[in-house]
């Protein structure tokens, strides 16, 4: 094969592999088997090995780097990666909206809601459409350059896709008709969408050819991968990861990108910045998808707070069946101008809030232990605790099952404990916090 023939073949293979990456990670469609896709990658790899001068930084073969890095470089974010305030009830959510309306009464207050992922926030900077820098959030202003590790995540595009003007027109039309679906405005909206799409498309092409686009999102580990990883940790007599966020963070901060690649992380985008002519958060989400960036399909436009609360309840009910962990939803003021006018308080934008699910764990103090006699005469110890609100209910009692469980926990009367009440199961003491002991605690003894 001549170099020119190899060049054409390599181009076609890259396009084919990138197409299937886009269809799988963005549209959740697997059009060919993983084995067939691996075969295409292997063919591309062999060609590039034979013609190394044709290797490009955005080739699918370049996701995994070579030698481990000695250390991570620091990266200053173009704009701070801020945090969010939390609310835990519809009443608190209403209070948040009231404060914002008081601050900016002329604002447009509709909302875009998405899942609050339990992962690691990262920034992806694309220059001329090519992934240039991937960084952790760090302290919000300065993060760490983990570009090589983020490249190993298949869901993250190495080069952004170029959307058509029609695709952009459809996005703008769809976002406008969700706000005002009345037939009387359809003609005006269509004309507006077409005019707007032309401007946005021109700006996107310019940014992809000679500009800068930043995608922010969440690198996360699925439930299945997390469980598999901890099984492997135990086999190697290494400490298991405490939670999926720690696992994702630990995987991203590996100096050897081969280790990161083996952890099988995933990614969802949630924010887009650049001079693109967009007007709403909803449009930004839709455009990310057109650019080849996966977004969480469980994201919804909400006309008012009632719709937000309904979305919150829907996700709460289905959370156990989701392939990832979540502890709430994120509510964003949809209109970009309103969002910007609301500004920032402390380290959190006023236009975004985390609407958390009822906590499934809480701390409380064991006041006494009572022993109940069952029908078969078996004694069951029951902890009487200070009332605590957990998983949507107030809990005062928790079974301790037997003395073996008390001994395993190292529990004493007066101890501060972590109480868990997940789903519909009965409350359970899962951990004692011995460092909070005062010396007044008492040993638990069964009745003689």
Q: Which sequence ranges carry the predicted segments?
A:
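N-terminal basic, low-structured, amphipathic or hydrophobic segments
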Residues: 169-174, 181-186, 190
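RNA/tRNA-interacting regions in translation and RNA-turnover enzymes
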Residues: 1-172, 192-448
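Compositionally biased non-globular segments, especially hydrophobic aliphatic-rich helices
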Residues: 180-181, 196
């Amino acid at each position: 094969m001549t170099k020119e023939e190899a060049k054409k073949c390599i181009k076609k293979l890259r396009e084919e592999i990138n197409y299937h990456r886009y269809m799988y990670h963005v549209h959740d469609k697997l059009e060919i088997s993983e084995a067939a896709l691996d075969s295409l990658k292997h063919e591309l790899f062999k060609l590039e090995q034979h013609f190394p001068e044709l290797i490009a930084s955005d080739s699918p073969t370049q996701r995994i780097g070579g030698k481990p890095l000695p250390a991570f470089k620091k990266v200053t974010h173009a704009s701070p990666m801020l945090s969010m305030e939390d609310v835990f009830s519809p009443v608190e959510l209403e209070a948040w909206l009231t404060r914002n309306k008081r601050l900016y009464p002329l604002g447009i207050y509709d909302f875009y809601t998405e899942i609050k992922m339990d992962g690691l926030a990262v920034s992806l900077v694309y220059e001329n459409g090519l992934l240039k820098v991937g960084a952790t959030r760090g302290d919000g202003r300065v993060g760490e350059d983990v570009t090589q590790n983020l490249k190993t995540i298949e869901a993250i595009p190495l080069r952004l896709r170029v959307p058509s003007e029609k695709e952009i027109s459809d996005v703008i039309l769809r976002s406008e008709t969700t706000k005002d679906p009345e037939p009387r405005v359809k003609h005006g909206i269509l004309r507006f969408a077409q005019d707007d799409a032309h401007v946005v498309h021109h700006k996107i092409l310019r940014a992809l050819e000679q500009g800068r686009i930043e995608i922010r999102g969440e690198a996360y580990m699925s439930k299945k991968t997390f469980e598999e990883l901890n099984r492997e940790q135990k086999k190697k007599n290494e400490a298991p990861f405490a939670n999926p966020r720690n696992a994702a963070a630990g995987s991203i901060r590996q100096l050897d990108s081969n280790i990161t690649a083996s952890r099988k992380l995933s990614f969802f985008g949630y924010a887009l910045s650049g001079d693109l002519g967009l007007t709403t958060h909803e449009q930004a989400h839709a455009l990310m998808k057109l650019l080849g960036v996966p977004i969480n399909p469980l994201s919804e436009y909400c006309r008012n707070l009632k719709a937000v609360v309904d979305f919150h309840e829907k996700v709460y009910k289905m959370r156990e069946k989701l392939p990832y962990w979540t502890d709430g939803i994120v509510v964003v003021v949809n209109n970009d101008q309103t969002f910007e006018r609301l500004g920032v308080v402390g380290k959190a934008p006023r236009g975004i809030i985390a609407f958390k699910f009822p906590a499934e764990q809480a701390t409380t103090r064991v006041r006494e232990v009572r022993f109940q006699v069952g029908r078969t005469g078996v004694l069951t110890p029951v902890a009487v605790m200070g009332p605590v609100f957990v998983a949507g209910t107030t809990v005062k009692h928790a079974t301790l099952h037997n003395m073996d469980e008390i001994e395993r926990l190292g529990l004493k009367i007066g101890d501060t404990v972590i109480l868990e009440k997940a789903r519909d199961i009965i409350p359970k003491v899962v951990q004692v916090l011995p460092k909070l002991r005062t010396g007044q605690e008492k040993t638990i003894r069964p009745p003689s």
